[in-house]
């Protein structure tokens, strides 16, 4: 049995995503396809444009058999944390045979060489990284130049290591190697617009450009499959989107104005004076864009700053994130499945090293059952399971507060919304 895993955000699901999925299936010829998908907040440090259940529905309509949620504590981390959370989830399910990810270079040897080198020589690389960071470079640039020196590579190497998907790909492979996972990995050449392109250009435009068009109320139908377009328009018609960082502006600024520097001491990602820059900037910022601009330096990128805001908002304690990045994902929360996927879920439930959560209301009962089960080798830490799960619930409760339609801003989305049971179209 071949089971393909894809790691996605689908924010929103667009033509490039469909191409990636179709190509992945051609490479692997899987019996089933699993998606590990970010929940209501995404890796760039932004809310998803529509909620996780609607995005899971679109995924099922386009060829995914089962959608699991990537816990918020990983979805809102940098490439390393994001990748580790997703790969540990796939690995602990024990049924996934292959993973396919997009890459600008599609150079498997390059990606593997860099991943192995980073994994085998962490101290030497860390020292080079610190030297570059002291020059005032952003983390991505510091990593790029440190890797160039570390591997003694040429200028072409620098161009490759700048690519968003190549960087993420390196982290995926690094996690697979670190876990000694048996999962096979494959690369697909990324086509169309670049990850960060902000304007619609072709059939394969970036998710960023499509979100910008949606927020500006511009046409976007050409750039997404019809199945995606219909669900997006339905959610918008009910006032359950679009949700954007701009919607949250006053809430975020108010939250930050209530903070003191000491409040950030225990929060993950507040290092190297970021807390001081937050406190200084919020005193003179009337708009979120002003705040981001004032905090930004070569070292602190916009994405890192946005993620740090949500780390503070969701109270991401350093000790728990570090613990999460050591032990990995503690459960597999189902967002949706097809009839075909239901057969796979039966197999997963018998073999998984982490509990499968289908009904969030019963998560405590599920945990208790796992902790008292002596017949199976579970990889679950009680304290971490509870903490990771609670952060998902908090994230949903905050997310729904920013639906355009006030009547839709209900508490307890995770407990009210049933699992999506869809069919491929």
UniProtKB/Swiss-Prot annotation:
Keyword terms, alphabetized: ATP-binding, Cytoplasm, Ligase, Nucleotide-binding, RNA-binding, tRNA processing, tRNA-binding
**Reported function:** Catalyzes the formation of N(4)-acetylcytidine (ac(4)C) at the wobble position of elongator tRNA(Met), using acetate and ATP as substrates. First activates an acetate ion to form acetyladenylate (Ac-AMP) and then transfers the acetyl group to tRNA to form ac(4)C34.
Enzyme group, top EC level? ligase
Name of the molecule in the record: tRNA(Met) cytidine acetate ligase
Instruction: Fetch the Gene3D superfamilies from UniProt.
Output: HUPs
Q: What is its EC number?
A: 6.3.4.-
Look up keyword Ligase and say if it applies: yes
Gene Ontology BP, a term = tRNA modification
Q: Binding of ATP: at which residues?
A: 7-20, 102, 165, 190-191
The protein's GO terms of the molecular function aspect are: ATP binding; ligase activity, forming carbon-nitrogen bonds; tRNA binding
Matching HAMAP family: TmcAL (MF_01539)
Cellular component, GO, one term: cytoplasm
Show the InterPro entries listed in the entry: Rossmann-like_a/b/a_fold, tRNA(Met)_cyd_acetate_ligase
Query: Which family is it part of?
Result: Belongs to the TmcAL family.
What gene name is listed for this protein? tmcAL
The cellular location(s) given in this protein's UniProt record come to:
Cytoplasm
- What chemistry does it catalyse, as a reaction equation? cytidine(34) in elongator tRNA(Met) + acetate + ATP = N(4)-acetylcytidine(34) in elongator tRNA(Met) + AMP + diphosphate
